[in-house]
From Swiss-Prot:
Functional note: Involved in peptide bond synthesis. Stimulates efficient translation and peptide-bond synthesis on native or reconstituted 70S ribosomes in vitro. Probably functions indirectly by altering the affinity of the ribosome for aminoacyl-tRNA, thus increasing their reactivity as acceptors for peptidyl transferase.
Protein biosynthesis listed as a keyword: yes
Gene Ontology molecular function: any one: translation elongation factor activity
InterPro entries with a match to the protein in the record: Elong-fact-P_C, NA-bd_OB-fold, Rib_uL2_dom2, Transl_elong_fac_P/YeiP, Transl_elong_KOW-like, Transl_elong_P/YeiP_cen, Transl_elong_P/YeiP_CS, Transl_elongation_fac_P
Keywords tagged on the record: Cytoplasm, Elongation factor, Protein biosynthesis
Chief place where the protein resides: cytoplasm
Cited SMART domains: EFP (SM01185), Elong-fact-P_C (SM00841)
UniProt similarity note: Belongs to the elongation factor P family.
A single GO cellular-component term on record: cytoplasm
UniProt pathway annotation: Protein biosynthesis; polypeptide chain elongation
Lineage: Bacteria, Pseudomonadati, Coprothermobacterota, Coprothermobacteria, Coprothermobacterales
Stated name of the protein: Elongation factor P
Length: 186
C-alpha cells in the first residue's frame, strides 16, 4: 500500500483489479476543508485516461511490474507477438495495449515486456529508434530563409517532421517519447 501523498508520475497502482499508470499528480490544500490529491491516470489495459481525486493520506495498492526483455516478431493487425530469446516462449499483446507504441515497432527489435502477476500488460520501447525514411517530398534548395521541415513516412508507417535535407532511403533516429526527429544516422 502507498499513501496518495506519495503518488508521482510513473508509479503504477492497482485500483479494483485494474492497473493505472500515474501521468500527473497534483497535491491541493484548499483554504477551507481537507487536502486532496488530483491524479490523472492512464489505464494500462486500453490506454484510456481518467482523472480521479483522492483524500490526502488515503492508501492505494501499488503494483510492481516484472520486466522481461523480449524480441518483437510480428503483428497480425489486432495482436502483437513477442518472443523470449532465452526460452523461445511467445507472448501476444492486444492492439489496445500497443496503441501508443506500435508505430515505433520494427520486426526483430528488442523491447521490455511488462508482466503483472504472470500476465503481459504492456511494453517499453527503446527511447531512441533508428528507422528508414520510405516516403518524403524532395527538399528544394532555397525553399525557406531558415531551416524548415517536411513530413516523412517511416518504414513502420509513422509520420514525423524532418529537416529538408532528409531524402528517401535515409536512416534517421527518432525519440519515441515525443515522436520527433533527432538526427540522421545513415
Amino acid at each position: 500500500m502507498i499513501s496518495t501523498n506519495d503518488l508521482r508520475p510513473g508509479i503504477i497502482v492497482d485500483l479494483d483489479g485494474t492497473l493505472y499508470l500515474i501521468v500527473t499528480a497534483q497535491h491541493v490544500k484548499p483554504g477551507k476543508g481537507s487536502a486532496f490529491v488530483r491524479v490523472k491516470m492512464k489505464k494500462l489495459s486500453d490506454g484510456s485516461t481518467i482523472e480521479q481525486t483522492f483524500r490526502a493520506g488515503e492508501k492505494v495498492q501499488r503494483a510492481y511490474l516484472e520486466t522481461k526483455q523480449m524480441q518483437y516478431l510480428y503483428s497480425d493487425g489486432e495482436h502483437f507477438v513477442f518472443m523470449d530469446t532465452d526460452t523461445y516462449e511467445q507472448v501476444t499483446l492486444s492492439g489496445d495495449i500497443m496503441s501508443d507504441v506500435q508505430q515505433w515497432l520494427k520486426e526483430g527489435m528488442m523491447v521490455n515486456v511488462q508482466f503483472y502477476q504472470g500476465k503481459a500488460v504492456g511494453i517499453e520501447v527503446p527511447t531512441f529508434v533508428e528507422l528508414e525514411v520510405v516516403e518524403t517530398e524532395p527538399g528544394v534548395r532555397g525553399d525557406t530563409a531558415q531551416g524548415g521541415s517536411k513530413p516523412a513516412k517511416l518504414e513502420t508507417g509513422a509520420v514525423v517532421q524532418v529537416p529538408l535535407f532528409i531524402t528517401e532511403g535515409d536512416i534517421i533516429r527518432v525519440d519515441t517519447r515525443t515522436g520527433e526527429y533527432v538526427e540522421r544516422v545513415g
